[in-house]
Curated annotation (Swiss-Prot):
Source organism phylogeny: Bacteria, Pseudomonadati, Pseudomonadota, Gammaproteobacteria, Enterobacterales
CDD domains xrefs: AdoMet_MTases (cd02440)
Name of this chain's protein: tRNA1(Val) (adenine(37)-N6)-methyltransferase
Enzyme class: transferase
GO biological-process terms attached to the record: methylation; tRNA processing
Amino acid sequence: MKQKRLLRRDGFTFKQFFVGHDRCAMKVGTDGVLLGAWTPVSDKKAILDIGCGSGLIALMLAQRTDENTKIDAVELDTEAALQAQDNAEQSPWQRKIDVYQQDIGDFAEQYSQCYDLIVSNPPYFEPAVACRNEAREQARYTGSMTHQQLLQYAETLITADGLFCVVLPYAIGEEFETMACHQGWFSHHRVNIRDRQGKPLHRMLLAFSRKEKTGLISELTIRQPDGAYTQEFQQLVTDFYLYY
Protein backbone atom coordinates (compact mmCIF):
# COMPACT_ATOMS: atom_id res chain seq x y z
CA MET A 1 0.00 0.00 0.00
CA LYS A 2 1.28 3.48 -0.93
CA GLN A 3 1.97 5.53 2.21
CA LYS A 4 1.75 9.29 2.46
CA ARG A 5 5.02 10.92 3.41
CA LEU A 6 5.39 13.10 6.50
CA LEU A 7 4.99 16.72 5.44
CA ARG A 8 6.45 19.88 6.94
CA ARG A 9 4.03 22.00 8.96
CA ASP A 10 5.58 25.42 8.29
CA GLY A 11 4.32 25.60 4.73
CA PHE A 12 2.79 23.68 1.85
CA THR A 13 4.42 20.83 -0.05
CA PHE A 14 3.74 20.56 -3.77
CA LYS A 15 5.00 17.88 -6.15
CA GLN A 16 8.09 19.78 -7.26
CA PHE A 17 8.62 22.44 -4.60
CA PHE A 18 7.88 23.55 -1.05
CA VAL A 19 6.38 26.92 -0.08
CA GLY A 20 7.26 28.06 3.43
CA HIS A 21 4.67 30.55 4.70
CA ASP A 22 5.23 30.74 8.46
CA ARG A 23 6.66 34.28 8.13
CA CYS A 24 3.89 35.52 5.82
CA ALA A 25 0.63 37.16 6.85
CA MET A 26 -1.30 35.30 4.17
CA LYS A 27 -0.79 31.56 3.91
CA VAL A 28 -0.91 29.30 0.86
CA GLY A 29 -4.56 29.07 -0.15
CA THR A 30 -6.91 28.02 -2.91
CA ASP A 31 -7.03 31.48 -4.52
CA GLY A 32 -3.30 31.55 -5.21
CA VAL A 33 -3.25 27.93 -6.37
CA LEU A 34 -6.09 28.60 -8.80
CA LEU A 35 -4.36 31.63 -10.29
CA GLY A 36 -1.00 29.87 -10.55
CA ALA A 37 -2.47 26.79 -12.22
CA TRP A 38 -4.90 28.57 -14.57
CA THR A 39 -3.04 31.64 -15.86
CA PRO A 40 -2.23 31.32 -19.59
CA VAL A 41 1.57 31.09 -19.99
CA SER A 42 2.06 30.08 -23.63
CA ASP A 43 4.98 32.04 -25.17
CA LYS A 44 5.33 34.24 -22.07
CA LYS A 45 8.97 35.24 -21.46
CA ALA A 46 8.73 38.09 -18.93
CA ILE A 47 6.34 37.70 -15.97
CA LEU A 48 5.59 40.03 -13.06
CA ASP A 49 3.88 38.92 -9.83
CA ILE A 50 2.52 41.97 -7.96
CA GLY A 51 2.24 41.35 -4.22
CA CYS A 52 3.85 37.92 -4.37
CA GLY A 53 3.57 37.06 -0.66
CA SER A 54 5.32 33.73 -0.10
CA GLY A 55 6.13 33.45 -3.81
CA LEU A 56 3.54 30.72 -4.44
CA ILE A 57 2.24 32.00 -7.78
CA ALA A 58 5.71 32.89 -9.06
CA LEU A 59 6.88 29.36 -8.28
CA MET A 60 3.88 27.76 -9.97
CA LEU A 61 4.46 29.85 -13.08
CA ALA A 62 8.16 28.99 -12.99
CA GLN A 63 7.23 25.30 -13.08
CA ARG A 64 4.88 25.85 -16.03
CA THR A 65 7.26 27.90 -18.23
CA ASP A 66 10.51 27.13 -20.03
CA GLU A 67 13.98 27.87 -18.71
CA ASN A 68 14.29 31.15 -20.64
CA THR A 69 11.31 32.77 -18.90
CA LYS A 70 12.16 35.39 -16.26
CA ILE A 71 9.85 36.11 -13.34
CA ASP A 72 10.02 39.23 -11.17
CA ALA A 73 8.11 39.01 -7.89
CA VAL A 74 7.41 42.24 -5.98
CA GLU A 75 6.35 42.25 -2.32
CA LEU A 76 6.03 45.21 0.05
CA ASP A 77 6.23 43.32 3.36
CA THR A 78 9.84 42.66 4.39
CA GLU A 79 9.35 39.27 6.05
CA ALA A 80 7.16 37.95 3.25
CA ALA A 81 9.68 39.09 0.63
CA LEU A 82 12.51 37.37 2.51
CA GLN A 83 10.49 34.17 2.71
CA ALA A 84 9.61 34.38 -0.99
CA GLN A 85 13.32 34.72 -1.73
CA ASP A 86 14.11 31.69 0.43
CA ASN A 87 11.39 29.67 -1.28
CA ALA A 88 12.71 30.61 -4.72
CA GLU A 89 16.30 29.76 -3.77
CA GLN A 90 15.28 26.32 -2.49
CA SER A 91 13.23 25.55 -5.61
CA PRO A 92 14.42 24.09 -8.93
CA TRP A 93 13.94 27.54 -10.55
CA GLN A 94 16.22 29.79 -8.53
CA ARG A 95 17.69 31.38 -11.67
CA LYS A 96 14.28 32.21 -13.12
CA ILE A 97 12.87 34.19 -10.17
CA ASP A 98 14.00 37.54 -8.74
CA VAL A 99 12.24 38.88 -5.63
CA TYR A 100 12.05 42.63 -4.93
CA GLN A 101 11.11 43.97 -1.49
CA GLN A 102 9.52 47.14 -2.76
CA ASP A 103 6.32 49.11 -3.22
CA ILE A 104 4.97 48.36 -6.69
CA GLY A 105 4.64 52.08 -7.43
CA ASP A 106 8.33 52.63 -6.71
CA PHE A 107 9.17 49.52 -8.74
CA ALA A 108 7.18 50.83 -11.72
CA GLU A 109 9.06 54.14 -11.61
CA GLN A 110 12.48 52.54 -11.15
CA TYR A 111 12.40 49.82 -13.82
CA SER A 112 11.68 50.36 -17.51
CA GLN A 113 11.02 46.72 -18.45
CA CYS A 114 7.56 45.71 -19.64
CA TYR A 115 6.04 42.26 -19.09
CA ASP A 116 3.97 40.05 -21.37
CA LEU A 117 2.24 38.54 -18.32
CA ILE A 118 1.33 40.23 -15.03
CA VAL A 119 -0.41 38.35 -12.22
CA SER A 120 -1.78 39.40 -8.85
CA ASN A 121 -3.76 37.93 -5.97
CA PRO A 122 -4.56 41.39 -4.63
CA PRO A 123 -6.00 42.68 -1.36
CA TYR A 124 -9.75 43.08 -1.56
CA PHE A 125 -11.11 44.32 1.79
CA GLU A 126 -11.84 48.05 1.98
CA PRO A 127 -10.12 49.73 4.96
CA ALA A 128 -12.44 49.74 7.97
CA VAL A 129 -11.49 48.63 11.46
CA ALA A 130 -7.71 48.44 11.68
CA CYS A 131 -6.22 44.95 11.84
CA ARG A 132 -3.96 44.24 14.83
CA ASN A 133 -1.37 42.65 12.54
CA GLU A 134 0.09 45.26 10.17
CA ALA A 135 1.46 42.68 7.72
CA ARG A 136 -1.92 40.92 7.54
CA GLU A 137 -3.64 44.27 7.01
CA GLN A 138 -1.33 45.01 4.07
CA ALA A 139 -2.07 41.62 2.55
CA ARG A 140 -5.86 41.71 2.99
CA TYR A 141 -6.88 45.39 2.81
CA THR A 142 -6.73 47.75 -0.16
CA GLY A 143 -5.33 50.63 1.90
CA SER A 144 -1.75 50.07 0.69
CA MET A 145 -2.84 49.61 -2.96
CA THR A 146 -6.32 50.23 -4.34
CA HIS A 147 -7.67 48.24 -7.26
CA GLN A 148 -7.61 51.38 -9.39
CA GLN A 149 -3.91 51.81 -8.62
CA LEU A 150 -3.25 48.14 -9.41
CA LEU A 151 -4.84 48.56 -12.84
CA GLN A 152 -2.77 51.69 -13.46
CA TYR A 153 0.49 49.97 -12.49
CA ALA A 154 -0.37 47.01 -14.70
CA GLU A 155 -1.06 49.35 -17.61
CA THR A 156 2.35 50.98 -17.12
CA LEU A 157 4.23 47.68 -16.94
CA ILE A 158 2.49 45.50 -19.54
CA THR A 159 3.43 44.98 -23.19
CA ALA A 160 0.99 45.76 -26.00
CA ASP A 161 0.09 42.07 -26.35
CA GLY A 162 0.39 41.19 -22.66
CA LEU A 163 -2.12 39.59 -20.29
CA PHE A 164 -3.01 40.78 -16.79
CA CYS A 165 -4.53 38.04 -14.58
CA VAL A 166 -6.10 38.28 -11.12
CA VAL A 167 -8.17 36.20 -8.70
CA LEU A 168 -10.85 37.84 -6.55
CA PRO A 169 -14.04 37.06 -4.61
CA TYR A 170 -16.95 36.90 -7.04
CA ALA A 171 -18.78 40.14 -6.19
CA ILE A 172 -15.54 42.12 -5.95
CA GLY A 173 -14.37 40.56 -9.21
CA GLU A 174 -17.46 41.91 -10.98
CA GLU A 175 -16.65 45.40 -9.68
CA PHE A 176 -13.00 45.00 -10.68
CA GLU A 177 -13.97 43.91 -14.20
CA THR A 178 -16.20 46.97 -14.62
CA MET A 179 -13.44 49.25 -13.34
CA ALA A 180 -10.91 47.65 -15.68
CA CYS A 181 -13.16 48.14 -18.70
CA HIS A 182 -13.60 51.81 -17.79
CA GLN A 183 -9.80 52.13 -17.73
CA GLY A 184 -9.37 50.72 -21.22
CA TRP A 185 -8.85 47.02 -20.48
CA PHE A 186 -10.66 44.25 -22.35
CA SER A 187 -11.81 41.01 -20.75
CA HIS A 188 -9.86 38.13 -22.32
CA HIS A 189 -11.19 35.28 -20.17
CA ARG A 190 -13.33 35.04 -17.04
CA VAL A 191 -13.81 31.89 -14.97
CA ASN A 192 -16.68 31.91 -12.47
CA ILE A 193 -15.87 29.57 -9.59
CA ARG A 194 -18.04 27.87 -7.00
CA ASP A 195 -16.57 26.02 -4.04
CA ARG A 196 -19.14 23.21 -4.17
CA GLN A 197 -21.82 21.97 -6.56
CA GLY A 198 -25.13 23.65 -5.80
CA LYS A 199 -23.53 26.58 -3.95
CA PRO A 200 -23.39 30.22 -5.13
CA LEU A 201 -20.47 31.48 -7.19
CA HIS A 202 -17.68 32.40 -4.81
CA ARG A 203 -14.52 33.36 -6.74
CA MET A 204 -13.51 34.72 -10.10
CA LEU A 205 -10.41 34.36 -12.27
CA LEU A 206 -9.93 37.22 -14.71
CA ALA A 207 -7.53 37.77 -17.62
CA PHE A 208 -7.36 41.21 -19.25
CA SER A 209 -5.67 42.58 -22.35
CA ARG A 210 -5.17 46.08 -23.74
CA LYS A 211 -6.31 44.76 -27.13
CA GLU A 212 -9.99 44.47 -27.96
CA LYS A 213 -11.35 40.97 -28.36
CA THR A 214 -14.41 38.88 -27.55
CA GLY A 215 -14.02 37.59 -24.02
CA LEU A 216 -14.50 33.96 -23.03
CA ILE A 217 -16.60 33.07 -19.97
CA SER A 218 -16.43 29.64 -18.33
CA GLU A 219 -17.17 28.02 -14.97
CA LEU A 220 -15.27 25.81 -12.54
CA THR A 221 -16.58 23.89 -9.52
CA ILE A 222 -13.99 22.85 -6.94
CA ARG A 223 -15.85 20.20 -4.89
CA GLN A 224 -18.65 17.73 -5.43
CA PRO A 225 -21.63 17.71 -3.01
CA ASP A 226 -19.85 15.08 -0.88
CA GLY A 227 -16.78 17.31 -0.52
CA ALA A 228 -14.51 15.40 -2.90
CA TYR A 229 -12.63 17.42 -5.50
CA THR A 230 -14.26 17.52 -8.94
CA GLN A 231 -12.52 15.97 -11.92
CA GLU A 232 -12.06 19.39 -13.53
CA PHE A 233 -10.33 20.81 -10.44
CA GLN A 234 -8.10 17.75 -10.13
CA GLN A 235 -7.07 18.16 -13.76
CA LEU A 236 -6.23 21.83 -13.15
CA VAL A 237 -3.95 21.13 -10.17
CA THR A 238 -2.63 17.67 -11.07
CA ASP A 239 0.89 18.97 -11.78
CA PHE A 240 1.05 20.55 -8.33
CA TYR A 241 -1.00 18.79 -5.65
CA LEU A 242 0.40 15.64 -4.09
CA TYR A 243 -1.58 12.41 -4.54
CA TYR A 244 -3.35 13.53 -7.76
